[in-house]
């Protein structure tokens, strides 16, 4: 019988990441054969992983990988059962390695990922070994990659706690403008992480959805106005009820009508026509802002920029286009939040203990 030394246990533990007693028992069962002990731990670990597979994994981390040339950006979400494990160094390394693997192999689906090879083994087996070592069910829930086209650029941002990740892609009219836009895209990703827009622009909104939201907006404002009339607080005047909710509704005819109305008002005020061109753009912008509240709530381009709330994201991009000397068009963005849409399982401690008996 081979003597099992502390050094042997330490070596096996460092190699497999398994617990100290598990390593000692594995070495004892295999008469000190290191390779057989590794295999035995894998076999036992895989058994544990299978048991854990039915546990709900709703915690975890989002990871972002941007290629060095800013032509590819990948975001992934890997779930664990507890927030504690999500802070584990080994789990953090797993998320980063998996995201890099997805990007470098241009993987398109979770099924494709599981059948791919990482570090010489099938990813599915690799993940099971990580489950056995870490001790919780781990699930690669989703991932996506954005690629830059000709004269395009991508970037990404991961919030410091790893719970929110964003990737974004833009098309530019030159490689020079694309290169200059890298930092801007990262800042817009930070905005997205904070403000969570649901759409890129008003053009992506469905008209029926807009019309229904307009009715809800009017009802909400009228209810608030009723309360303000009751309180009679001079510091809280009644809301102005908008005619529309989105630029999606502002046809050329409606904009033309609004402009003509502004001209009539200026004429009635006795403003000389020679200064109208200086006044009309600002009043038209106010008209559009008043009648696009849905856009500022739900769309990236219509939201006020978190780093300068006097301007919309669209206006910030327009300023950068002038500064960089070319066009910048946001093509797509993707935002992942850990556990988004998953129902977290809650149990009291007594129930948890009882479930294990």
UniProtKB/Swiss-Prot annotation:
One Pfam match: EF_TS
The entry's keywords: Cytoplasm, Elongation factor, Protein biosynthesis
Keyword Cell inner membrane: no
Region Involved in Mg(2+) ion dislocation from EF-Tu, residue ranges: 82-85
Coiled-coil features, chain-numbered ranges: none
MF terms in GO: translation elongation factor activity
Localization annotation: Cytoplasm
Entry's Gene Ontology cellular component terms: cytoplasm
UniProt family annotation: Belongs to the EF-Ts family.
Stated role: Associates with the EF-Tu.GDP complex and induces the exchange of GDP to GTP. It remains bound to the aminoacyl-tRNA.EF-Tu.GTP complex up to the GTP hydrolysis stage on the ribosome.
Protein name stated in the entry: Elongation factor Ts
UniProt organism field: Campylobacter jejuni subsp. jejuni serotype O:2 (strain ATCC 700819 / NCTC 11168)
Gene expressing this chain: tsf
């Amino acid at each position: 019988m081979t003597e099992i030394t502390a050094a042997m246990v330490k070596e096996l533990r460092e190699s497999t990441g398994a617990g100290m007693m598990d390593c000692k028992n594995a070495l004892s069962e295999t008469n000190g054969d290191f390779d057989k002990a590794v295999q035995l731990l894998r076999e036992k670990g895989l058994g544990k992983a299978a048991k854990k597979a039915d546990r709900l994994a709703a915690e975890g981390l989002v990871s972002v990988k941007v290629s060095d040339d800013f032509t590819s950006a990948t975001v992934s979400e890997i779930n664990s059962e507890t927030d504690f494990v999500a802070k584990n160094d080994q789990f953090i390394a797993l998320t980063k390695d998996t995201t890099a693997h997805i990007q470098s192999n241009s993987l398109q689906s979770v099924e494709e990922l599981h059948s791919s090879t990482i570090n010489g083994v099938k990813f599915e087996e690799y993940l099971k070994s990580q489950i056995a070592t870490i001790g919780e069910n781990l699930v690669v829930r989703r991932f996506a990659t954005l690629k830059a086209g000709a004269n395009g650029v991508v970037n990404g941002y991961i919030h410091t706690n790893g719970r929110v990740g964003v990737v974004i892609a833009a098309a530019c009219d030159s490689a020079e403008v694309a290169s200059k836009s890298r930092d801007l895209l990262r800042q817009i990703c930070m905005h997205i992480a904070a403000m969570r827009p649901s759409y890129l622009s008003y053009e992506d909104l469905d008209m029926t959805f807009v019309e229904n939201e307009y009715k809800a907006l009017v009802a909400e404002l009228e209810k608030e106005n009723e309360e303000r009339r009751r309180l009679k607080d001079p510091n809280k005047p009644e809301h102005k009820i908008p005619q529309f909710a989105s630029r999606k509704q502002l046809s050329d005819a409606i904009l033309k009508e609004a402009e003509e109305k502004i001209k009539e008002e200026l004429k009635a005020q006795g403003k000389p026509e020679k200064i109208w061109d200086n006044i009309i753009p600002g009043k038209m912008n106010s008209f559009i802002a008043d009648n696009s509240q849905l856009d500022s709530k739900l769309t990236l381009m219509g939201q006020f920029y978190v780093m300068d709330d006097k301007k919309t994201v669209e206006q910030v991009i327009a300023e950068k286009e002038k500064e960089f000397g070319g066009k910048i068009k946001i093509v797509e963005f993707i935002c992942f939040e850990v556990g988004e849409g998953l129902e977290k399982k809650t149990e009291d401690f007594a129930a948890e203990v009882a479930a294990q008996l």
